[in-house]
Amino acid sequence: MQQHYDYIIVGAGSAGCVLADRLSESGDHSVLLLEAGGSDKSIFIQMPTALSYPMNSEKYAWQFETDAEADLDGRRLHCPRGKVLGGSSSINGMVYVRGHACDFDEWEEQGAKGWNYQACLPYFRRAENWIDGEDEYRGGDGPLSTCAGNKMTLNPLYRAFIDAGKEAGYPETSDYNGYQQEGFGPMHMTVKNGVRASTSNAYLSRAKKRSNFKLIKGVVVQRILLEEKRAVGVEFELAGELRTCFAKNEVISSAGSIGSVQLLQLSGIGPKTVLEKAGVTPVYHLPGVGQNLQDHLEVYFQYHCQKPITLNGKLDWFSKGLIGTEWILTRKGLGATNHFESCAFIRSRAGLKWPNIQYHFLPAAMRYDGQAAFDGHGFQVHVGPNKPESRGRVEIVSANPLDKPKIQFNYLSTERDRQDWRDCIRLTREILAQPAMDEFRGEEIQPGINVATDAEIDQWVKENVESAYHPSCSCKMGADDDPMAVLDEECRVRGITNLRVVDSSVFPTIPNGNLNAPTIMVAERAADLILHKQPLPPQRSKVWLAPSWETQQRTGEPMR
């Protein structure tokens, strides 16, 4: 095995596959990519409708869970992370949400200089191949294919949800990834010709064809090799044997918001007390490693449907067989979508500059494991506040890389977070009570109309909320004078040369949306920084903000 490379990347996930492609693209640099998981060539990964299978599989995901969460009455929440080529982009729901422009301006305000929206937009566009073609906001010839699924044509409930939002006094938006995030409209997904567009399919497939690129799967990375606070390589286990490889230029951790923290701490980089408690010799005391952990929570707000038009009628094995057969033969139909084809982003109160609540609409009533919630037809919205105040941490518990780390999000630990949830439940109920839903809406299944007071909502949320699987921000970028900043604005680990982190852990704050799109953008921009390329010129595109955001929660008056 070749031992020396210009760049070594740990983790073939949403960011690692992008870096593998971009760093090997010129042919001038040798690149090694190490991945713990294996092949992504499974129908359960590639067929969009099968998304619940890989996420709940030991084969394709690290099945982490949180420590007992005090403000969820001691519940432990599921926290799966991709362990397969493509990482979490191969097991996620394929929802493509960049986040609001103000999220990235917030990053810069928090000390990540050069990561404002004007600087990030060109990299979102470079990554993307939007099915409707390039415009000022969308990319038209990038590796990552995005589309709107079946464009809401296969179920009238998608449009009814958008109409209900308008009747409740909210705007409609034709493209939440473009000029206007706020409002109700169609939802976008990373799907190409009916197949999941993971970063493995979009980026890694290109790198694999190059002689200067090497991929090794089934690897457990033990630690980053350090010489006098300089990263020189990695030590890893392959087929039961310890091996080392060396990096001439840089080692890059793209192991995700849990994995990158583990790797830094196992290598002696992190809070001194955490390292010593785990039996790891501290090399460099960096107190922010594993801190600032953030996530999105969500609930399934469910109703019976009065018409037999929902996906609940397609969950028997015969129907699944027909859907699968059509997909195998044509790559079309109900197998070719994640079924989230309409959505919304709203503000929960006046005085918020940009949305903090997100809706995914699903024409089915399902449980978290993908099974039917009950006999009969129903629909649901996945909803939750997206700008939590609560902050958590990730800590290794031993020097063994296979020991699961301690993960504590401290969900709902602030009064603001709890109030956001009360607002969220009440606003959702109001939206779904609008006239556009009348012909479809049956009884409220959950929360149930008996959940109405603050105390009742608080208790129901504690018992029913789940992670949206968006752990992030645990190795944040920040300014030199921020003692908790793990990275500088070029994703370089403070105090250690030739070492970067590039994945969702670098975010200073969690954006208002799903994480895959901004993680890919971060990797695109980081690739230019790593290669010392001139960054793409900033793009001064306008962004819509509600004209009366300081005094009004929404732009119009509700019909009901």
Swiss-Prot record:
What PROSITE patterns does this protein's entry cite?
A: GMC_OXRED_1
Describe which pathway this protein belongs to, using the record's wording. Answer: Amine and polyamine biosynthesis; betaine biosynthesis via choline pathway; betaine aldehyde from choline (cytochrome c reductase route): step 1/1
Q: Name one GO molecular function term.
A: betaine-aldehyde dehydrogenase (NAD+) activity
What broad class of enzyme is this?
A: oxidoreductase
Catalytic reaction annotation: choline + A = betaine aldehyde + AH2; betaine aldehyde + NAD(+) + H2O = glycine betaine + NADH + 2 H(+)
Q: Does the keyword Flavoprotein apply?
A: yes
List the EC numbers from the record.
Answer: 1.1.99.1, 1.2.1.8
Q: Where is the active site?
A: H470
Does NAD show up as a keyword for this record?
A: yes
- List membrane-spanning regions: none
Q: Which UniProt keywords apply?
A: FAD, Flavoprotein, NAD, Oxidoreductase
Q: Which InterPro entries match?
A: BetA, FAD/NAD-bd_sf, GMC_OxRdtase, GMC_OxRdtase_N, GMC_OxRtase_C
Note the superkingdom of the native organism.
Bacteria
Biological process terms from the Gene Ontology for this record are: glycine betaine biosynthetic process from choline
- For binding FAD, which residues are annotated in this chain's numbering? 6-35
- GO CC, alphabetical: membrane
What does this protein need as cofactor? FAD
Say which family it is in.
Belongs to the GMC oxidoreductase family.
> What does it do?
Involved in the biosynthesis of the osmoprotectant glycine betaine. Catalyzes the oxidation of choline to betaine aldehyde and betaine aldehyde to glycine betaine at the same rate.
Q: What is this protein called?
A: Oxygen-dependent choline dehydrogenase
- Give the encoding gene's name: betA
